[in-house]
Curated annotation (Swiss-Prot):
It comes from the Eukaryota. This is Pleckstrin homology domain-containing family H member 2. Residues 703-797, 811-919 form the PH domain. Residues 202-230, 245-335, 363-439, 613-705, 1474-1493 are annotated as: Disordered. Kidney. Reduced expression in patients with focal segmental glomerulosclerosis. SMART domains: B41 (SM00295), MyTH4 (SM00139), PH (SM00233). It is found in: Cytoplasm; Cytoplasm, Cytoskeleton; Cell membrane; Cell projection, Lamellipodium. Residues 1121-1451 form the FERM domain. GO terms for molecular function: actin binding. Residues 20-175 form a coiled coil. It is a peripheral membrane protein. One of its GO terms (cellular component) is nuclear body.
Length: 1493
């Protein structure tokens, strides 16, 4: 300043400015130094403060300890001190002695270890010798086996020559003599199938007929059981009546005890078409679909049936004592074997004698059509008259050997379809051909408990056999429970006594008119009659009641009301028909819900619906290569085979041991679940050609050749065809039958390195993909399929030891394309590190590993490029960079394996993860953070270790310059640094409720990157552990938001070892319920456990999830999130869940809150709306996570409607019925009935339920009474009359709009609406004072009158050319099958049982159903195509598959139940209801007889 004030001389401002700038720079340098010194000093002071605080805390603790000691200690004398000193000396000496003992024990342990090692070596030497001996012995057996095969072939040729000669001799004889002689040969065939009844048990001893009659006379208690066994009904057609008469005479002549034996054979109802099923179909009857019509074949069928019948009787009698409690058939095939025959389900409460009369008329009609129509006079006939008729026909029953399968009355509800009209029109679709084998169904012999036993052991009055059903339904009701007590509307106008009988005794009297049918003699009948009188005299006669007038009126309307009114406006419905065929859905959302399925294709195998493709079939998707030339050759071979296999051909017997070859001559295969598929009946080893791999071939060379029957999906008609496959020379050829192998094959499949084998759903099918085609194959049993897979994999040079070990389970730690070098050979493979094992595959898409390397305790290190294998690899000229890196893996007791890696980043990542997987303590690999974690792991996370204070493990305000973990590429390293910046922004910015979207966006973007790049999941977990390891002052919010972000992160995924170990330790050290930080640590611990239990998530957190975590203190709740679930009656239930809750767990919580049964019993499912806003719903699978559903729905909604506010629309969850089972209706809860009523009302409103206008009003009145209550009449006072009248009118209009069908109210004038409201009010007032439960019961009783109640209807248009026309129709999916209904009237066109559905699903842009027409010879399969919207195709496909698989699960559940277990289950009624099962006997069910407890 002094220089500036001097006036002398001019001032050089430029120099002055430069000088000042230099001074400024000096000041800045000094200031920066001062800042650095201050920063260092501050850090030093902070450390000192921390140390001081820690020391002060320790000192404070010591002071407290000393104070406690001073307070507790008394003044000790010198004697007490001496005593304590002596005690201390004694303890020290005792410790020394213990140490000596421990050392001695350790020495002994070491000696024992050495001894065990020596013994192990000796055992290994012995095992090697034994193995060598076994190998030599097997080779000798193999040579001997080959010699035996040659001998067998020679003898087979001789047998064929003899049979041809025998056939010529037989042709010269008369038809009667030939029939008698053929019976012996066919008996052998039928005996083979007769033994199916006893498979999975010891072979039964066949009992002679005389011995059987003795047994039955000595053991009278079995007679009642036999009454409930199966009976025979003859199959009578135009062309074989005479033969059946002859057969009947021979049966009477050959079986003296025929009347008793015939009670033991199985029965089934004759269908409308009059086609009975042949329970004893011979082998030759199955072998060709074209061979029926010759008289010789009819004769052979008759004789074979007779012998099969007698053989099965002996088997059943010999095992009666051991099998009297069986409740299901022995075979494990589908439940549809009992429902194949399209049997007509009896309507509820009708006496069983009417059904018996229908059977009797069907048997005596020349064409067997007496069961199609029943007159009222026939229906009203008494049970006594019918019993006399049946007794007069007992001779026909005992003399018939070609029987139809008729279920016994106790199984009638189980075996009959629900829909009585399903056989009209083209109802013959339900009737399979008699060529199919019958179901092996045995009636549970629960009625063999004698009266004396019941009296002695159960302390009950003596019972007659016709009362046993009402009192001992234990095993029977478990097979198929009876439907609930509902009123049969057809009997409303009858006498009140008849109504009472039908309501109260439908299970007792009606069904047991059967019992008098088979009474052995008059004495037994008199005994039954006397027993009846005793039973009837025990309980008091219940009072007779008529229906109330209001209920009778509703039932009277319902009798004729289940139909459409003639006049209503269909224009509004027709307008929407074409529009509904064109919706699409959001791919992002549906890819999560349906697991990337678009329109899948299913096939029916072993009674189960098995998915064979997740996308629709195209024209060439199934790879049919049956060219025209091969077809012509197949026709030639077929005609030759027909000429060779005449009536007396032993062709079937030659292959009769193998069920897989029974239908080899047929072009279309019998479905695999139509016969037994035990491996013991598969192709015998001696019969296989030389190319077939023998099961006893345990040599070192793996088999590369095989032949046998497989089922192949055809090309144009998607049906299964049985073909004889021959694998030889790396090529898979297929023929029509084994005899055609000398001709040109029908097709061939070239197996090359580009082929892939993918197992289908539930390991039922195999998808073989080549360069040109995709083939779908299946076998008769899983074991045969596994053998084929193994041989095919050997051909494809897949060295997997066990073909069942597909893609290893678990989350891969690392994966990538590497070059593996071993023993000088190099190969480019896809490597995946899972756990402590390195798997390598041929390609990334391959599911079968080529091999694996166990890494535990292996030596993993980086090596220089000095090994010979590397140099050889470079010399070979492969396409690998010359600058590659090498990692060597040296497992214990194995040679080294070299991995060649192209980049340094990738090499570092692989080296670190391989080292960790090997369990190495090497801390010189990986990043600095990883090395520190490894050191902590070596010291087991010692809390006092200085490693915890390392800056790399602690919170830092500055960004990181390199990732905390090793990453395989530079791009991922850059992303990791950006990820840390995003976490810093989330942590440092204060949470503001109005601007919460900023934090939501940051969290979603960061976690989405980690889901897209799984390599970054370890990185973000390590970053959040680092940023939450230091406690900030309470006024800084940073660390708390770090804990919140960590909670969101661990709810999605978990890091790998050892970072998972570090995370658990970090959470454990910070868990403290007294602080907010500690509460979040406890919440994170819960999230870690749940994520480890249910697996990783698929979608980023939703807005709702992030809001709940940031603002609503999630640590206070075990289920921190909640969402409303809507019901069909307009109410909702809020249900809680966490980040890992699956749909199955969510539904368990919902059912507990609402008092409903499990979805498997109730048929209810959870649905979501479509994000696009269209009227679509998506059914949720049980393993999807609720949070993923909400998140994907939000993302799809934003994409499809970007302009709307994201926070306003959320996913809507609806809980409603998806699968309806009439057998489960008995255990419906009140809530289920209510929701079912409202769901039915929704169908009525939308025109998916047929009812006329009168019945619609009655139903609307019932719903109004349930929802609103009693109808409020207008007040009579002038003051309030106007206001109240307006209120009443408004209520009536709302009811009409809510409960009355749209099609009936659209277009109505004001006057018509007023009259409609007046009629509704009249019906509503009639319900005054009645409870909601009564109204719900009546509503469902009326609704169940429609045969398709509970079915889901889909609008479809048949694709021309089709026999169904080209107009719109309804596809009704219900528990018994698929039905086609007329569009306007909803009358049945045709029904198909699920058994006849071969393939169903997407075909191009349409819905495809392939039907097995077993009754048609000209067209054994039929493919139906329907134009539908793609979402509806997916929905109907999954719905059909669910029905089929649910029946299969029910069959499996009931299969192993026994009567003693069921008897014990009855005593546990309340417990069974708690577990969701149904009680076997309802305590409220009225009965006339005493009940067995």
């Amino acid at each position: 300043m002094a220089e500036l004030s001097e006036p002398e001389g001019p001032v050089d401002w430029k120099e002055r400015c430069v000088a000042l700038e230099s001074q400024l720079m000096k000041f800045r340098v000094q200031a920066s130094k001062i800042r650095e010194l201050l920063a260092e000093k501050m850090q030093q002071l902070e450390r000192q403060v921390i140390d001081a605080e820690r020391q002060a805390e320790k000192a404070f603790q010591q002071v407290q300890v000393m104070e406690d000691k001073l307070k507790a200690a008394n003044i000790q004398t010198s004697e007490s001190e001496t005593r304590l000193y002596n005690k201390c000396q004694d303890l020290e000496s005792l410790i020394q002695e213990k140490d000596d003992v421990i050392q001695n024990l350790e020495l002994q342990l070491e000696e024992q270890k050495q001894i065990r090692i020596q013994e192990a070596k000796i055992i290994e030497e012995k095992a090697a010798k034994i193995k060598e001996w076994v190998t030599v012995k097997l080779n000798e057996l193999e040579l001997e086996n080959q010699n035996l095969r040659l001998i067998n072939q020679n003898q087979t040729e001789e047998i064929r020559t003899m049979q041809s000669k025998l056939q010529e001799v037989q042709g010269k004889k008369s038809s009667t003599v030939s029939t008698l002689k053929l019976s012996e040969g066919q008996r052998l065939s039928s005996l083979t199938f007769g033994c199916f009844l006893s498979r999975a048990r010891s072979p039964p001893q066949v009992v002679k007929s005389e011995e059987m009659s003795k047994i039955s006379s000595k053991e009278p208690e079995f007679t009642e059981g036999k009454d409930m066994e199966e009976m025979e009904i003859p199959e009578k057609s135009v062309d074989n009546q005479v033969l059946e008469n002859n057969r009947g005479q021979r049966t009477l002549h050959q079986t003296p005890c025929g009347s008793e034996q015939n009670r033991k054979t199985r029965t089934s109802f004759a269908t409308d078409g009059g086609i009975s099923q042949n329970s004893g179909a011979p082998v030759s009857d199955w072998s060709s679909d074209e061979e029926d019509g010759s008289k010789g074949r009819s004769k052979s069928r008759c004789t074979s049936t007779l012998s099969s019948h007698t053989s099965e009787e002996g088997v059943q009698c010999s095992r009666m004592g051991s099998e009297m409690y069986l409740t299901a058939s022995d075979d494990s095939s589908s439940i549809f074997e009992e429902e194949t025959f399209g049997i007509k389900r009896p309507e509820h409460k009708k006496l069983y004698s009417w059904q018996q009369e229908a059977q009797w008329k069907a048997l005596n009609s020349p064409l067997g059509k007496g069961n199609s129509e029943l007159s009222k006079k026939e229906q009203d006939s008494s049970s006594d008259e019918l019993n006399k008729k049946f007794q007069s026909q007992r001779l026909d029953y005992s003399s018939s050997s070609s029987e139809a399968n008729t279920p016994s009355p106790i199984l009638t509800p189980a075996l009959m379809p629900k829909h009585p009209n399903s056989l009209s029109g083209k109802g013959t679709q339900l009737v399979p051909s008699s060529h199919l084998p019958p179901p092996k169904l045995r009636i549970p012999n629960v009625f063999s408990i004698s009266v004396a036993l019941a009296k002695r052991h159960l302390s009950q009055p003596q019972l007659s056999s016709d009362r046993m059903f009402g009192t001992n339904r234990n095993a029977i009701s478990m097979i198929r429970p009876l439907r609930p007590q509902e009123t049969d509307l057809d009997l409303v106008d009858g006498d009140s006594t008849e109504v009472l009988e039908n309501m109260d005794t439908s299970c007792d009297d009606g069904l047991f008119s059967y019992d008098s049918l088979d009474s052995p003699n008059s004495d037994d009948q008199e005994h039954c009659d006397s027993a009846k009188k005793v039973a009837y005299s025990k309980p008091p006669t219940p009072p007779l009641h008529r229906f109330p007038s209001w209920e009778s009126r509703i039932y009277a309307v319902a009798k004729s009301g289940i139909r459409m009114s003639e006049a209503f406006n269909m224009e509004s419905v027709n307008k929407n028909s074409a529009a509904t065929l064109s919706y699409t859905t959001s791919g992002l959302y549906t890819s999560l819900i349906y697991k990337n399925m678009t329109t899948p294709v299913y096939t029916t195998l072993k009674g189960k619906a098995t998915q064979i493709s997740s996308s629709p079939f195209l024209d060439d998707s199934s790879g049919s290569e049956e060219e025209d030339s091969s077809r012509s050759s197949s026709r030639t071979s077929e005609s030759d085979s027909r000429s060779r296999s005449g009536p007396g051909s032993p062709r079937a017997m030659k292959r009769g041991v193998s069920l897989s070859s029974v239908a080899s001559e047929s072009d279309y295969a019998i479905p695999p679940d139509a016969y037994s598929t035990d491996t013991e009946y598969s192709q015998p080893e001696q019969k296989l050609p030389k190319t077939c791999s023998s099961s006893s071939d345990n040599g070192k060379n793996e088999p590369l050749e095989k032949s046998g029957y497989l089922l192949k999906m055809s090309g144009k008609v998607k049906s299964w065809k049985r073909r004889w496959f021959v694998l030889k020379g790396g090529e898979l050829l297929y023929y029509k039958s084994p005899s055609d192998v000398i001709r040109k094959p029908q097709g061939h499949i070239e197996l090359s390195a580009s082929c892939s084998i993918l197992r289908g759903d539930n390991k039922q099918t195999v998808q073989l993909t080549t360069e040109k085609h995709t083939y779908y194959l299946t076998a008769d049993s899983p074991n045969i399929l596994e053998e084929w897979i193994k041989v095919l994999q050997n051909v494809l040079r897949v060295q997997a030891a066990n073909p069942l070990s597909l893609q290893p389970e678990g989350k891969p730690t690392m994966k990538g394309l590497l070059t593996k070098v071993k023993h000088g050979y190099s190969k480019r493979v896809w490597c995946t590190l899972i756990g402590k094992t390195l798997y390598y595959f041929r390609s990334q898409e391959d599911k079968f590993p080529l091999g694996q390397i166990k890494l535990w305790e292996a030596k993993v290190e980086e090596v220089d490029r000095s090994c010979d294998s590397d140099e050889d690899y470079e010399a070979s000229g492969r396409s690998l960079l010359s600058t590659h890196y090498t990692i060597v893996i040296h497992p214990k007791d194995q040679g080294p394996t070299y991995l060649l890696i192209g980049s340094k980043h990738e090499k570092d990542t692989w080296l670190y993860h391989l080292t960790v997987a090997a369990g190495s303590n090497n801390v010189n690999v990986g990043s600095e953070f990883e090395q520190l974690v490894c050191k902590l792991l070596n010291i087991d996370g010692e809390p006092s270790s200085q490693i915890w204070r390392h800056p790399t493990l602690c919170h830092s305000k500055e960004g990181i310059i390199s990732p905390l973990t090793t990453l395989p590429s530079e791009a991922l390293q850059t992303e990791a640094i950006k990820l840390f910046k995003t976490c810093q922004l989330f942590i440092n910015a204060a949470v503001d409720s109005p601007a919460i979207d900023y934090h939501i966006s940051l969290a979603q973007s960061a976690l989405q990157i980690c889901l897209t790049h799984p390599e970054l999941q370890n990185e973000i977990c390590c970053q959040l552990i680092k940023q939450t390891r230091r406690r900030q002052p309470q006024n800084q919010p940073g660390p708390l938001q770090g804990w919140q972000l960590l909670a969101l992160c661990v709810g999605l995924f978990l890091p790998h070892h050892p970072f998972l170990w570090l995370l658990r330790l970090h959470l454990k050290r910070n868990a403290d319920s007294r602080t907010e930080f500690g509460k979040y640590a406890i919440y994170c611990q819960r999230c870690v456990e749940r994520t480890q239990q249910n697996g990783d998530r698929e979608a980023r957190p939703s807005r709702m999830e992030i809001l709940s975590t940031l603002l609503r203190n999630p640590y206070h709740h075990s289920l921190p999130f909640s969402i409303p679930v809507h019901f069909m009656n307009g109410i909702y239930q809020v249900v809680g869940f966490d980040a890992s809750t699956t749909v199955e767990e969510f539904l368990n919580t919902l059912n507990q809150d609402t008092g409903m049964r499990k979805p498997a019993q109730s048929g209810f499912a959870l649905f979501t709306d479509d994000p696009s806003g269209r009227d679509l719903e998506h059914c949720l699978q049980g393993n999807i996570k609720i949070c993923d559903i909400i998140s994907k729905w939000e993302q799809a909604s934003k994409e499809q409607q970007p302009g709307k506010c994201e926070g306003t629309r959320t996913v809507r969850l609806t809980y409603k019925n998806r699968l309806y089972f009439s057998v489960q209706a008995r255990g419906e809860t009140d809530r289920e009935k209510l929701l079912l009523m409202y769901q039915t009302n929704d169908q009525i409103i939308n025109g998916l339920f047929p009812l006329n206008k009168d019945l619609a009003l009655e139903m609307a009145a019932l719903l109004s009474q349930v929802e609103i209550g009693d109808f409020e009449r207008p007040f009579s006072t002038p003051a309030g009359h106007v206001t109240n009248q307006c209120k009443v009118n408004q209520t009536l209009k709302q009811v009409i709009e809510k409960f009355y069908p749209k099609r009936y109210r659209d277009g109505c004038s004001e006057e018509q609406l007023r009259q409609l409201c007046q009629r509704l009010s009249t019906r509503w007032m009639a319900l005054r004072g009645h409870s909601a439960a009564d109204c719900v019961r009546i509503y469902l009783t009326v609704a169940r009158k429609w045969p398709f109640f509970g079915a889901k209807l889909f609008l479809a248009k048949p694709i021309t050319p089709s026999s169904l026309g080209s107009t719109f129709l309804w596809l009704a999916v219900h528990e018994d099958g698929l039905s086609l209904l007329e569009y306007n009237s909803m009358r049945l066109i045709v029904s198909y049982v699920y058994k006849s559905l071969m393939t169903f699903g997407g075909y191009q842009d349409d819905f495809m159903v392939v039907i097995n027409n077993t009754h048609s010879k000209d067209k054994p399969t039929e493919k139906l195509l329907f134009a539908m919207a793609k979402p509806k195709i997916l929905e109907i496909t999954l719905l059909i598959a669910s029905y089929i698989n649910n029946f299969h699960q029910q069959k499996a559940a009931f299969h192993h139940l026994s009567a003693p277990a069921l008897l014990s289950a009855q005593t546990r009624g309340p417990q069974a209801r708690m577990m969701g099962s149904q009680p076997l006997l309802s305590s409220s069910r009225p009965t006339k007889g005493p009940t067995l407890l």
